[in-house]
From Swiss-Prot:
<dbReference type="InterPro" id="IPR033248">
    <property type="entry name" value="Transketolase_C"/>
</dbReference>
<keyword id="KW-0808">Transferase</keyword>
<feature type="binding site">
    <location>
        <position position="72"/>
    </location>
    <ligand>
        <name>thiamine diphosphate</name>
    </ligand>
</feature>
<feature type="binding site">
    <location>
        <begin position="145"/>
        <end position="146"/>
    </location>
    <ligand>
        <name>thiamine diphosphate</name>
    </ligand>
</feature>
<dbReference type="GO" id="GO:0005829">
    <property type="term" value="C:cytosol"/>
</dbReference>
<dbReference type="InterPro" id="IPR005475">
    <property type="entry name" value="Transketolase-like_Pyr-bd"/>
</dbReference>
<dbReference type="InterPro" id="IPR005477">
    <property type="entry name" value="Dxylulose-5-P_synthase"/>
</dbReference>
<dbReference type="Pfam" id="PF13292">
    <property type="entry name" value="DXP_synthase_N"/>
</dbReference>
<keyword id="KW-0414">Isoprene biosynthesis</keyword>
<comment type="pathway">
    <text>Metabolic intermediate biosynthesis; 1-deoxy-D-xylulose 5-phosphate biosynthesis; 1-deoxy-D-xylulose 5-phosphate from D-glyceraldehyde 3-phosphate and pyruvate: step 1/1.</text>
</comment>
<dbReference type="InterPro" id="IPR020826">
    <property type="entry name" value="Transketolase_BS"/>
</dbReference>
<dbReference type="GO" id="GO:0008661">
    <property type="term" value="F:1-deoxy-D-xylulose-5-phosphate synthase activity"/>
</dbReference>
<protein>
    <recommendedName>
        <fullName>1-deoxy-D-xylulose-5-phosphate synthase</fullName>
        <ecNumber>2.2.1.7</ecNumber>
    </recommendedName>
</protein>
<keyword id="KW-0786">Thiamine pyrophosphate</keyword>
<keyword id="KW-0479">Metal-binding</keyword>
<dbReference type="GO" id="GO:0000287">
    <property type="term" value="F:magnesium ion binding"/>
</dbReference>
<comment type="similarity">
    <text>Belongs to the transketolase family. DXPS subfamily.</text>
</comment>
Amino acid sequence: MHLGDLKHPNELHGLSPAQLEDVARQIRERHLQVVSTSGGHLGPGLGVVELTLALYQTLDLDQDRVIWDVGHQAYPHKLITGRFNDFDSLRQQHGVAGYLKRTESDFDHFGAGHASTSISAALGMAMARDNHGESFKCVAVIGDGALTGGMALEAINHAGHLPNTRLLVVLNDNDMSISPPVGALSNVLNRARLSPPMQFLSGSVEESVRHLPFMGGEIPAELNRLKGSMRRLAVPKVGAVFEELGFTYMGPIDGHDIGEMVRTFQAAHREGGPVLVHVVTKKGKGYPYAEADQVGYHAQSAFDLGTGKAIPSSKPKPPSYSKVFGQTLVKLCEQNSRVIGITAAMATGTGLDLLQKAVPDQYVDVGIAEQHAVTLAAGMACEGLRPVVAIYSTFLQRAYDQLIHDVGIQKLPVTFVLDRAGIVGADGPTHQGQYDISYMRAIPNFTVMAPKDEAELQRMLVTCLQHDGPTALRIPRGSGEGVPLMEEGWETLPIGRGELLREGDDLMIVAYGSMVAPALATATLLEEAGLSTTVINARFLRPLDQALIHPLARRIPRVVTMEEGALPGGFGAAVLESLTDQDINVSMLRIGIPDKLVDHATPQQSKEALGLTPAQMAERILERFSNTSGDLPASASIKALQA
C-alpha cells in the first residue's frame, strides 16, 4: 500500500505486521523529506510513528476521537488522514498547518499548539458522549513533558473521580519535551522507564482465561478483583500514582512494538473507566542525528538529510534578540548573584541555555508550568532575589492571574522577558505573540517596554533589574538590527522617556519596539512624497512619555501609531486615550494587527498580508490623510516612487 493512495485511515485495519512496517517506513521517509526541505518539527513525530499506527488499528476513526497534546507530534496522524500528497506545503502560507486545526480535517478533533490541554478536552468529549448516550472512544495522547503541566494534572484529578467515564490517556514517554523535562514526576517516570516491561492480567493472561471453555468468554467478578489486587502489587511506582488517582494503569510498554501496543490498547478499551497506557518511545526514532541530539532536532529549519546539518542562509545575519538577551543576562548574573534566570521548559528558545551553561546555580527550569514560574519568581523577589522570567509572549497568557495577583498587586521586582512577541510565522495563530501589549498594559504597577534594537534591549534589561517594581520587556523573534553591542557597562534608561528620532511638521509617527525601524523607513518614503515626518521611539508602553508626545501632537495635526501587536487595547489605543484625556484633537491612524487571527506563513508574508511593510504603511498613511485633510502636498504613490 502506498500512503498517497490511502483514502481513509480505517483502510489500515487488518494490515499484516510486514505491511504496517512498510507504512511506518513511508511515514518516516515523507516526514524527513518534507521537514528537511522546508523546516518544521522533526523529533516528536518520528518518535510516535508506531504508536500512531498501533492506536489507529484499534479505533474506528469515523467516530472515535483522538486528541493530540500540543500537536507537533501529529505529523504521522496528518500523513494517514488525507494530507500525504499535500504535505510538501507544511507550515507554508495556505498549506498544511504545523499543528492540528479543526478547520483543516474532520480527523483533527481538537486544535492546539500549547501543552497540557489534551486530557481536559478528551474528558469533556467523553462526558458529552455519555450525556448523549453515545459510545465512541475518546483518547488523549500526551507527552511526559506536557504531563508535568498543571492543567494536565487537574484533568487527571477530575477524570479519576469519574470511574464510569471511559477515557484512554496514552502517555508518550520519550523523556523529553523540547528540553529534558524536570521535576519529581519526571524522575518517577524515568524509574519506571528503566524497569522491566510489565505484563498485566488485563492483557495476555486475561485473554487466556477468557477463552477457557468453562468461562464462556466472561471474566467472573472474583477474577476481576484478583486482577485489581495483582495490578496494585505489580505496577511500578508511577503506575501506583495513577492507580491511586482512579486510573487503571498499563505499562510501561515498548512504543516501537506495534503488536504489543495493539494488544495493550485493545485491553485498555475493554476497561469501563479512565485508563492510562504508558508507552516508552524514542524521540527522533529512525534518523540517527535526531536520536543523538533530541533537543537540537526537536524542530529544525531546512537541513541536509545526509549530514543532518542545517542549510546556511544566503548571507550572515546579526545575532537574534534571544541570543543577545541570554548573553547579557549571563554577564549580569556573573556580576550579581541575586539575579536568577527562570524558564518554563524553553531554555534554548529564550536564550537561557547560555545561562544554564555559564552560571547554572542562577538558572531554574520549572518545566511546562508558566503559572508556577511567575509565582515562584514572586516568592524569590519577596526574599531579595531579582528573578528574570523568560517566557514566550503566547505562553505567558497562561499565567495572567499570577501576573496580576502575585506580582502586580504586590509591586514585586520581577522582570519578565516576553520572547517571540509579535508575528512569529509558520507556527500560526496559537503561537503569534500579538496579545501581550494589550494584556500587559492593563496591569497596575507594571513598567512595560520594548527596544528598537538589540543594543537598546541590553540597556532595558539593566533598567529592569535596577527598577524597584515589576517590569516587562518584549522582544521579537529573529535577528536584531545589526547595531554595535557593548560587552558591559550598559547605562539605564530613564523610566517612561521616549526618544525623538527625526523631526517634521506634517505628520508624527509614534512607534513601539520592533516597529521603530519600519517607521523610519516609512518616514523616508513619506519625505520623498513630500510629507515632512516626525518619528518617536516610544520605548515605554507603561508609563507612556506624555511629556514628549503631547506637545508635538498639539503642533502636528496628524498622528500615526505603529505596533506589532493587536490593535484592540494596544499601543495605539494607549496613545489615543492619552491624547483624548488631555483634549488633544488630532487626525489619527493606528497601524498594527487588526482584530483577527494570523495564520501560518513566513513572518514577511504575514506582514505583507497585514499591510505592515514600509511601502504599504506609507501608502495607507497618504490615503488616510488625503481623505481628511486638503492641505497635504500632492504626490505620486509610494509604489511609483519606489519603481
